[in-house]
Each structure stands twice: as C-alpha cells, then as structure tokens.
Amino acid sequence: MPFTFKLFHVDDSRCGMPVSTDGVLLGAWAPLVQAKTILDIGAGSGLLSLMAAQRSQAKITAIELDNDAALDCQQNFDASHWSERLEIICCDIQAYCQREQARQFDHIICNPPYFANGPQSSKFSRATARHTDSLSFDALLQAIKQLLAPEGQASLILPTESVSLLEAILSTYNLRLCHKLLAASVEGKAPNRQILVLGHDLKAKKIHNFGTELQAVAQQQLYIREKTGHYSLAFTLLSQDFYLKL
C-alpha cells in the first residue's frame, strides 16, 4: 500500500514487506552523522535509504534480492528529491560482496529477515522478506565485516528473541556491539525490538571482567506508544520529520 511521508512517497505494492514501524524506527534512530557512504542491505521498497537520504548528504547504495521489490525501490528513488544520491542494485548480498571486494561504506543499515523457522507465508516474496532463509545472520555479518569501513558502524533492528543468536556469533566476524536501543511497543511492556549498532572489534575501550575483555556498550530504552495509545514523546521526536501527522 502506498505510504506518503513529509518529504517522500513509498510505493510498496510489489514488495514482500510493507512500510512498518520497525523500519521507521531504525531509519530515524540509526547514527548516520558524518556518514558519506551508506549501504542498505535488503532494501525492499527503499524506505531506509530514503530516510537516510533525508537525514544525511551521503551517497546511498541499496541492495535488494527480489526483482519486484527492486522495481518499487527504483521507482521510489526516482520520484524522490535525492535520486542523484540513491542507487538500487538487484542481487543478493553475497554476489555483491564478490563483485565489490574493495568497496567499503561508512554506515550499513539493515532490517533483516526475522523468522528463523516456522510456517512460510503464502506469498513467496513476503515469506522471503520475513524468513532468515534468504539472509542468514552469518551471511549478514560476513557482509558487514567485508563492506564496513574500519571506523564505520552498522545498524540492525531485530526482535528481542533473536538478538542473543546474533550476539553469540559477533566475535566470529571480529565485530562488536557498540550501542543498543531497547524498544517496547507500549509503555510498561517488555522490549520486543532492539536496534543494535555494530562496529569492527578494534580493541579500543575495554572493561576487564574475570580475565575476559569486554567492550563497553551504551544502552537506551524507548517505548513507541503510551498506555493511552498515543505515540510517546520520544518516538514523536524521532519520527516527526517523517510522519505527516506529527
């Protein structure tokens, strides 16, 4: 269903996953300050890329596996104010890594597939967008390891129940957790989404704990709606540059 924001329009009619609060939260919160190049892995309709273009002056490359979604993405890019800074490439991230072995980005953003197993959706493209079969955590982290600039950061949004699976394999790819946002859908509820900001493990700032070196991780919390059903002040401040009615 087409979705109109303050400065751009998103047509996701051919895309497996529609515009979501998850995407808006990640696009609004990701720390993009001073990023000159941004990579959007699994771009879908291009929402994250368009939000990044509005928030920065970066050159943005979007990678999307599904051809129909890539067509939506290209259409949305062409209709935006920032078309000269946006490009969409239709391929999987592994193929892109092989083709662009020397290229690196200041920031990587990704709203990855989040169902590791379970029944597939009746619509194949929606199933592909929702299941990690199309982009495993190992494949994602390998791509981040290769494509992220030495001082760059990668921002991902995941369901809380999937976070430990990803965190457990970060060290395998010499990546570390730098920052975490715990997001609850409603005030008083447990966080059901987390944004993880990753970086290369450069052994910069450490805390020693029982002989094991641990990196200090900044952590924030946010709830999207108050108990009344209205958007919280924190989410309103984050998203007011994008949503029409805020």
Curated annotation (Swiss-Prot):
Its EC number is 2.1.1.223. One of its GO terms (biological process) is tRNA processing. Keywords: Cytoplasm, Methyltransferase, S-adenosyl-L-methionine, Transferase, tRNA processing. It is an enzyme of class 2 (transferase). One of its GO terms (molecular function) is nucleic acid binding. It comes from the Bacteria. Specifically methylates the adenine in position 37 of tRNA(1)(Val) (anticodon cmo5UAC). This is tRNA1(Val) (adenine(37)-N6)-methyltransferase. It comes from Shewanella halifaxensis (strain HAW-EB4).
